[in-house]
């Protein structure tokens, strides 16, 4: 096994939502070391111009490659939609993106009405338009931007009256239109599953693509002979903003109490990250 295979996989999101993907990767690929980076200083990406999203995503991913990551998982639907092709052109490591799980939703739906809850940027992207055209078939697809949800989740708020009020506004019209399946089209939204269940009960089957992304990563690493062996180190957690929300979310989601590190990734070259003790 090469030293390169023992290098970490970088997992990147605009904020904390990608922790749902990191959890799935740890379950599927326990030997892989993971470096999680939350660009929380600039979250949420979903309300920013496409040019900013693409440029910022490339800058952060260049930095992760500079830290020695052997592969990257873009655990952010918005960043994937706006930048994944650019990343694959510019970076010399495998890049795995995420996209709304519309294909499994269409296969699952019995009513042939599917809801998609995602950021406005994802829903407006050419990548999503192509996905919709390719897989929707005879399904009616109801697309709803999740305005206001990501900032609440970034603060650790996943079940407050404010969250429930927004979710009711977004989900009740889908239910009234006959939707029986809901695509969680942002990696933040799996944290809302309990709140969604409170509103919809068992009327909606929820589609979360975290484990599909993890399996795709595993296949990609195997094809490139980059699979790690042995016991992985604990994940490292980095943020471009206050680390306390990241630490709190990791504790709640993974049952761990990590010491996250704050970093600065500007528009110009930055020094390498200090070695982790």
Swiss-Prot record:
Protein name: Glutamate racemase
Domain of life: Bacteria
Cell wall biogenesis/degradation in keyword set: yes
First-tier enzyme category under EC: isomerase
Active-site residues, as the UniProt record annotates them: 76 (proton donor/acceptor), 186 (proton donor/acceptor)
Pathway(s) the chain acts in: Cell wall biogenesis; peptidoglycan biosynthesis
Pfam family, one: Asp_Glu_race
Methyltransferase keyword on record: no
E.C. no: 5.1.1.3
UniProt entry keywords in alphabetical sequence: Cell shape, Cell wall biogenesis/degradation, Isomerase, Peptidoglycan synthesis
Function of the protein: Provides the (R)-glutamate required for cell wall biosynthesis.
InterPro entries xrefs: Asp/Glu/hydantoin_racemase, Asp/Glu_race, Asp/Glu_racemase_AS_1, Asp/Glu_racemase_AS_2, Glu_race
Catalytic activity entry: L-glutamate = D-glutamate
A molecular-function term among this protein's GO annotations: glutamate racemase activity
GO terms classed as biological process: cell wall organization; peptidoglycan biosynthetic process; regulation of cell shape
Organism field: Ralstonia nicotianae (strain ATCC BAA-1114 / GMI1000)
Binding positions for substrate per the UniProt entry: 13-14, 45-46, 77-78, 187-188
Family: Belongs to the aspartate/glutamate racemases family.
């Amino acid at each position: 096994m090469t030293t390169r295979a023992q290098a970490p996989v970088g997992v990147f999101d605009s904020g904390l939502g990608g922790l749902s993907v990191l959890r799935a990767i740890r379950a599927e690929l326990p030997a892989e070391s993971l470096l999680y980076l939350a660009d929380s200083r600039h979250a949420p990406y979903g309300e920013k111009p496409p040019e900013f999203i693409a440029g910022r995503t490339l800058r952060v991913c260049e930095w992760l490659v500079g830290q020695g990551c052997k592969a990257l998982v873009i655990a952010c639907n918005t960043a994937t939609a706006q930048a994944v092709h650019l990343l694959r052109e510019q970076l010399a490591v495998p890049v795995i993106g995420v996209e709304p799980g519309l294909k499994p939703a269409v296969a699952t739906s019995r009513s042939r009405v599917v809801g998609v809850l995602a950021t406005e940027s994802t829903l407006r992207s050419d990548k999503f338009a192509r996905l919709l055209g390719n897989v929707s078939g005879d399904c009616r697809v109801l697309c709803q931007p999740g305005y206001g949800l990501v900032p609440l989740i970034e603060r650790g708020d996943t079940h407050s009256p404010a969250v429930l009020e927004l979710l009711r506004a977004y989900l009740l019209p889908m239910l009234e239109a006959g939707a029986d399946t809901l695509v969680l089209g942002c990696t933040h939204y799996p944290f809302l599953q309990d709140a969604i269940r409170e509103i919809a009960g068992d009327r909606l089957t929820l589609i979360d693509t975290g484990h599909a992304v993890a399996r795709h990563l595993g296949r990609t690493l195997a094809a490139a002979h980059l699979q790690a062996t042995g016991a992985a180190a604990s994940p490292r957690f980095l943020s471009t903003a206050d680390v306390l929300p990241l630490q709190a979310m990791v504790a709640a989601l993974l049952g761990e109490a990590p010491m996250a590190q704050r970093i600065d990734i500007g528009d110009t070259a930055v020094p390498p990250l200090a070695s982790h003790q």
